[in-house]
Amino acid sequence: MSFRDFTFPQVCTDLGLNFDEKSLFRDVAPISIDAHTQEFLELGRTMSSGINNEKARSEFVIAPFLLKLYILSGKRFGLFSGTELNVDASRGLNGVCDFLLAREPLVYMLRAPLIAVVEAKNDNVNNGFGQCVASMKAIELFNHKHGKPTETIYGASTTGVAWKFFKLQDTNLTLDSDDYDFSNLDKIAGILMHIVTTK
């Protein structure tokens, strides 16, 4: 069993989480994404839609968007792609995370505290919920194990076009009730910047 085997909402029962749904980022200010980057991402969206698989969406849309955010932040966080996170195999809290965001801007080493996970899905953003939540719980345990416990862990499930966000605080899981899509890139950028810069 691994992250990918978890389903939602069963993951809440499996991991002993209390679930709630409410707006999380309504007051977060958007960050302007320049026209060149938007054009580049639109091209990536078109290409990935034609190829129609998770790898294409991850490489052509999500990774470039996160890399742009990394630059806009002044390289203030660590960004890892396709990294294994093996915390507790007996509970299925192991596997490969599409993208991990870390507090420290390291490139060659995954170090606590991790702050967020972004999971890529091909067609339906909801299909990534179970995997995303399990990865968030693994991050919480990883940070605790390495002496860097964090109060809040964030997660996102995305097709590169649609985005849904989660927040985990101990055993309390909250799904953001607001939906975001490709037309809200500035808002999505603002949310992600809020996540990586808030301590």
What are these language model-derived features?
Residues 123-174:
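Nucleic-acid nuclease catalytic cores
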Residues 69-79:
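Short secondary-structure junctions
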Residues 77-107:
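Active-site metal-binding core of divalent-cation-utilizing nuclease and nuclease-like domains
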Residues 61, 97-105, 113-122, 135:
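Conserved catalytic cores of phosphodiester-cleaving nucleases, focusing on short active-site segments
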Residues 1-67:
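Charged, often low-complexity linker/regulatory segments
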Residues 81, 114-119, 153-159:
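Extended hydrophobic secondary-structure segments that form protein cores and membrane-embedded regions
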Residues 157-199:
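Short terminal or interdomain "cap/linker" segment that borders an active site or interface and mediates
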Residues 38-44, 111-119:
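Glycine-rich, often proline-containing surface loops adjacent to acidic residues and nearby aromatics
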